[in-house]
């Protein structure tokens, strides 16, 4: 079950997958296979023809291995910037090309390789985590099945399968099963077991929790890697403001940066001066506001006092006017009385005069 699941999980291909390690085990295994096949070969012309065909195949394989090794060495030299050996002509051509390629292109290639490595490592880590998850699920299911009782295939069937495999191995030893057929058989067996095995509704929450925990762990590690990458970029001297440019543009950029820094310092000093002036003006304005408020209060108090005085004067004048008006009316009445008496007195005089005149005649 575990091998089938591991084969089902997709794995990411890296640029180091092409690199092959030379080991004597492959040659020993090939020699053993050749000896085994030659020992079991039939005598006669058919055996000789087979041996010739095997020798041709071996020569082709050796040529392919040499080509793959040369390509792997070239890839190693490109990846790690090593000086390749001068043995093979293809490596010499690669050395000439690496010398002719400019430094800028090499650095760009190196950055691209770094990005690819980061992506590949993250993908491989996720794939490994998925594999571990699936394996843990399978182990959990197997342990639960073992605890509840063997719900799978009975032992008689297992024994029959083993006997069949032994018989097949004894009969068809020279035949080899390809990887694809083996994986397809494992997949079919897994599907049949999944169909046979009853669903586990109680364990869905457990697996969901496992997946959530794994996703959280992946996110945390990605954040940590990102933060470490950012800090390393800022800490490394490669992050310094000196990119590899042509025609001495780095010096020009340095001078411009220095000028900008000087301008920034000047602007900061000007801003500090203006801040001090602004504080002084603010203090003065606050003082003026206080003075104006005090002056307004004084003016208001004086005006109120004047209004009170005027009101008192008005009251006094109204009293005087009323008294004068009463005296005037009294005088008018007196004048009227005197006029009436005068009229009476004048009338008496006229009557006396007329009487005297009549008496004198």
UniProtKB/Swiss-Prot annotation:
Please tell me whether the keyword Coiled coil is annotated for this protein: yes
Q: Where in the cell is it found?
A: Golgi apparatus
Q: Name one GO cellular component term.
A: Golgi apparatus
Keywords attached to this entry? Coiled coil, Golgi apparatus
Return the Low complexity bias intervals. 35-48
Residue ranges of coiled coil: 51-79, 246-296, 326-346
Q: Tell me, what is an example of a GO biological process annotation in this record? A: signal transduction
Q: Which InterPro entries match?
A: GKAP1
- Protein's UniProt keywords contain Coiled coil: yes
Q: Where is the composition biased (Basic residues)?
A: 158-168
Q: Which domain of life is it from?
A: Eukaryota
The segment annotated Disordered runs over 22-111, 140-183
Q: Which family does it belong to?
A: Belongs to the GKAP1 family.
- What biological function has been recorded for the protein in this entry? May play a role in the regulation of insulin-dependent IRS1 tyrosine phosphorylation in adipocytes.
Q: What is this protein called?
A: G kinase-anchoring protein 1-A
Q: Please name the source species.
A: Xenopus laevis
